């Protein structure tokens, strides 16, 4: 549902009379998204360095719930392992979100200079686990753990970021069944839209561990939709290469397809790989220095960008500061293109799914309600179509239209 920008309410919203342009000084841009940008800034009242997300709510009106979700979760968090939220300001249609500035960049940025060694990985994973342990104790699920959403301070402190898809578990709703996250890092039970809990974050952590070791997640050379089909079907990914036994065992523990057998974040903090290899976070400043040297040597900004990173690091500019991930909001259809019919498929994305496919499956299941194996096969097919539609909106419409065209052609050919 579209919202009027003036009606937007988020935790920590400051008096609308306050002018953020007077309270804060924008410095260089450190990130860019579909509907806004992230700037390094100065709080003119305290001289504190902050990060300023500026979102155009008129452009992002269909994503306001995601924006509110991120701000709500961040405002409820009080942990040194989660990025701090300072408040929001509304000026016209622009929402200014003031957050903690972390000058070390994201783990994805730092990976552009090369994979991490096991001591660096263990140190970073330990801090991520502390963040997850905090979130899970607060009955929150991050749901999008990956290198792009792990930020570092210039001193090497590690914090979780990007809570646009984070979920809250209540006492009466212990498991969720919504389809969110990034395909390469997504747990099997999330893809299958089964009930899931905080153990989904543990799977994503295991994939992130492989990402830190290899520079990219498993299956990053494949199309995301194909990955959505393979993750539930295939055996879990394993860490291949010259790595220690304890590191491989850590990853295997995270990537158990049965979530009930995955350890909790608290249990993983006691894992041999973490206990024996993690160091003080200041050890991670070498990664930040390495990245600065790599940039200074004139490496192309596009060299390390890959389809598997969900485009977090695309659109980088040549500046000495690592860019922040800014994936809170997604691009919506262009109204002008809609008027011209150029994006008609986007408007009708779910029409065939809701009007034809879903009712057809319901009728099939009702007809065979006493045939358990047949009903199970129907449900699996229905889930697969839902997964395909989520990964590639509009694919169901195209399939149905193609089937109708084929049927009409066959009927015409058979006519006397």
Curated annotation (Swiss-Prot):
Region (Disordered): 296-343
Major location (coarse): cytoplasm
N-acetylalanine modified-residue sites: 2
Phosphoserine modification, residue list: 4, 300, 304, 306, 309, 325
Subcellular location: Cytoplasm; Golgi apparatus
Subunit field text: Homodimer. Interacts with PDCD10. Interacts with GOLGA2. Interacts with CTTNBP2NL. Interacts with RIPOR1 (via C-terminus); this interaction occurs in a PDCD10-dependent and Rho-independent manner. Interacts with PDCD10; this interaction is required for the association of STK26 with RIPOR1. Part of the core of STRIPAK complexes composed of PP2A catalytic and scaffolding subunits, the striatins (PP2A regulatory subunits), the striatin-associated proteins MOB4, STRIP1 and STRIP2, PDCD10 and members of the STE20 kinases, such as STK24 and STK26.
Keyword set includes DNA-binding: no
Biased composition (Basic and acidic residues): 331-340
Activity regulation comment: Interaction with Golgi matrix protein GOLGA2 leads to autophosphorylation on Thr-178, possibly as a consequence of stabilization of dimer formation. May also be activated by C-terminal cleavage.
EC number(s) given by UniProt: 2.7.11.1
Function of the protein: Serine/threonine-protein kinase that acts as a mediator of cell growth. Modulates apoptosis. In association with STK24 negatively regulates Golgi reorientation in polarized cell migration upon RHO activation. Phosphorylates ATG4B at 'Ser-383', thereby increasing autophagic flux. Part of the striatin-interacting phosphatase and kinase (STRIPAK) complexes. STRIPAK complexes have critical roles in protein (de)phosphorylation and are regulators of multiple signaling pathways including Hippo, MAPK, nuclear receptor and cytoskeleton remodeling.
Ranges of residues in domain Protein kinase: 24-274
Organism for this UniProt entry: Mus musculus
Residues that bind ATP: 30-38, 53
Broad enzyme group: transferase
Annotated family: Belongs to the protein kinase superfamily. STE Ser/Thr protein kinase family. STE20 subfamily.
Protein name: Serine/threonine-protein kinase 26
Active-site annotation: 144
PANTHER family xref list: SERINE_THREONINE-PROTEIN KINASE 26, STERILE20-LIKE KINASE, ISOFORM B-RELATED
Superkingdom classification of source: Eukaryota
CC annotations in GO: apical plasma membrane; cytoplasm; cytosol; FAR/SIN/STRIPAK complex; Golgi apparatus; Golgi-associated vesicle; membrane; perinuclear region of cytoplasm
Modified residue annotations for Phosphothreonine: 178, 327-328
Pfam families assigned to the protein according to its UniProt record, in alphabetical order: PDCD10_N (PF20929), Pkinase (PF00069)
Keywords: Acetylation, Apoptosis, ATP-binding, Cytoplasm, Golgi apparatus, Kinase, Magnesium, Metal-binding, Nucleotide-binding, Phosphoprotein, Serine/threonine-protein kinase, Transferase
Cofactor requirements of the protein: Mg(2+)
Reaction catalysis annotation: L-seryl-[protein] + ATP = O-phospho-L-seryl-[protein] + ADP + H(+); L-threonyl-[protein] + ATP = O-phospho-L-threonyl-[protein] + ADP + H(+)
């Amino acid at each position: 549902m579209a919202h009027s920008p003036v009606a937007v309410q988020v935790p920590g919203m400051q008096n609308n009379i306050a002018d953020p342009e007077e309270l804060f000084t924008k410095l260089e841009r450190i990130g860019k998204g579909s509907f806004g940008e992230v700037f390094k800034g100065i709080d003119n009242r305290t001289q504190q360095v902050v990060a300023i997300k500026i979102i155009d709510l008129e452009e992002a009106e269909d994503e306001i719930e995601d924006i509110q979700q991120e701000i709500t979760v961040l405002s409820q968090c009080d942990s040194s392992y989660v990025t701090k939220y300072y408040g929001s300001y509304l000026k016209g249609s622009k929402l200014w979100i003031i957050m903690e500035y972390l000058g070390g960049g994201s783990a994805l940025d730092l990976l552009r200079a090369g994979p991490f060694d096991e001591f660096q990985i263990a140190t970073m994973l330990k801090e991520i686990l502390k963040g997850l342990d905090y979130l899970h104790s607060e009955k929150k699920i991050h749901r999008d753990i990956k290198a792009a959403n792990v930020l570092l301070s210039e001193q090497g402190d590690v914090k979780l970021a990007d809570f646009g898809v984070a979920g809250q578990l209540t006492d009466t709703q212990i498991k969720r069944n919504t389809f969110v996250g990034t395909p390469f890092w997504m747990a099997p039970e999330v893809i299958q839209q089964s009930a899931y809990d905080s153990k989904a974050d543990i799977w994503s952590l295991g994939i992130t561990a492989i990402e830190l070791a290899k520079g990219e997640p498993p299956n990053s050379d494949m199309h995301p939709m194909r990955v959505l089909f393979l993750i539930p079907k295939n055996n879990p990914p394993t860490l291949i290469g010259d790595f220690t036994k304890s590191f491989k065992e850590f990853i295997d523990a995270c990537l158990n397809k049965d979530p009930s057998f995955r350890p909790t974040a608290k249990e993983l903090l006691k894992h041999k790989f973490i206990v024996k290899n993690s160091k003080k976070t200041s050890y991670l400043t070498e990664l930040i220095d390495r990245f600065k040297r790599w940039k200074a040597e004139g490496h192309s900004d596009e060299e390390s960008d890959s389809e598997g990173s969900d485009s977090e690091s695309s659109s980088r500019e040549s500046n000495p500061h690592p860019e922040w991930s800014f994936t809170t909001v997604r691009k919506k259809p262009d109204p002008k293109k809609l008027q011209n019919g150029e994006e008609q498929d986007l408007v009708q994305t779910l029409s065939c799914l809701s009007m034809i496919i879903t009712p057809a499956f319901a009728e099939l299941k009702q007809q065979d309600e006493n045939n358990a194996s047949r009903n199970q096969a129907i449900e699996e097919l229905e889930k697969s179509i839902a997964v395909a539609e989520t990964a590639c909106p509009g694919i169901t419409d195209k399939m149905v239209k193609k089937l109708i065209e084929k049927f009409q052609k066959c009927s015409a050919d058979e006519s006397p």
